[in-house]
C-alpha cells in the first residue's frame, strides 16, 4: 500500500510538466500568431500538430488509467499524425518557421512525457530523463553560450535519430528487462549524438 501511494505521489510530477507545456505552447501560438503560415491563417498542418499535442498530453495520465499498451497506441497515433502534418504543410503550402518550431516543440514534449512515464511508472532510473531533457538543454545552451549561432535546421540524421529514439522508448514501454532497457539506451545514445552534431553545426554558423 505504501509503495502504491508513493508511486501515485510521484506520478503527480507529470502533471506540472503537462501544465507548463500547455502554457508555453499558448505563449508560442500568441507570439507567432502573425506568422502561422505564408497566408497568415493557422493552417491545416498546424491544426494537425495541435491535435498531436492534445493526444500526447494523455501520457501524463496515471498508470492506473493508462497502461503501457494504451501509451504505445497514443505514441503510434502521434507519430502517424507527425507524418500527416508534414504532408499537409507541403500539400497546402502551410510550411513556415512557426510551423517548424511548433512541430519540434511538440516532438520534444512527446519525448519528455514518455521518459517521465518510463521513470515513474515503468521502473527505469532517473537517467532515462536525459533523452527527454536534451532538447531543452540544447535550446538553453544556444541562448546562453557566447558565440553560438541560430538553431540548425533539423537534418535527415536528426529525423532518423528521433525515429530511432521513439522506437527505443516504445521498447522500454512494452519489452521486459534488459530488452526494453537496451532499446532505451541505444535510442538515447543516438539522439545525444544528433544533438551534439546540431550543436557543432550551430557553432559553425556563427
What are the roles of these predicted feature ranges?
Residues 93, 101-105:
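Short hydrophobic alpha-helical segments within the ABC transporter permease transmembrane module
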Amino acid at each position: 500500500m505504501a509503495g502504491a501511494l508513493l508511486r501515485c505521489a510521484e506520478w503527480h510530477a507529470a502533471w506540472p510538466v503537462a501544465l507548463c507545456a500547455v502554457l508555453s505552447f499558448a505563449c508560442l501560438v500568441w507570439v507567432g500568431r502573425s506568422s502561422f503560415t505564408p497566408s497568415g491563417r493557422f493552417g491545416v498542418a498546424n491544426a494537425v500538430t495541435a491535435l498531436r499535442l492534445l493526444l500526447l498530453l494523455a501520457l501524463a495520465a496515471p498508470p492506473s488509467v493508462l497502461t503501457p499498451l494504451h501509451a504505445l497506441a497514443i505514441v503510434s497515433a502521434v507519430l502517424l499524425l507527425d507524418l500527416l502534418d508534414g504532408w499537409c504543410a507541403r500539400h497546402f503550402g502551410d510550411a513556415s518557421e512557426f510551423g517548424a518550431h511548433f512541430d519540434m516543440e511538440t516532438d520534444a514534449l512527446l519525448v519528455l512525457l514518455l521518459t517521465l512515464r518510463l521513470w515513474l511508472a515503468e521502473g527505469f532510473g532517473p537517467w532515462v530523463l536525459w533523452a527527454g531533457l536534451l532538447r531543452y538543454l540544447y535550446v538553453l545552451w544556444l541562448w546562453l553560450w557566447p558565440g553560438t549561432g541560430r538553431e540548425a535546421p533539423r537534418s535527415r540524421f536528426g529525423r532518423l535519430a528521433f525515429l530511432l529514439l521513439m522506437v527505443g522508448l516504445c521498447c522500454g514501454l512494452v519489452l521486459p528487462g534488459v530488452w526494453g532497457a537496451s532499446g532505451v539506451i541505444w535510442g538515447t545514445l543516438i539522439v545525444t549524438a544528433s544533438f551534439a552534431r546540431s550543436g557543432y553545426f550551430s557553432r559553425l554558423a556563427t
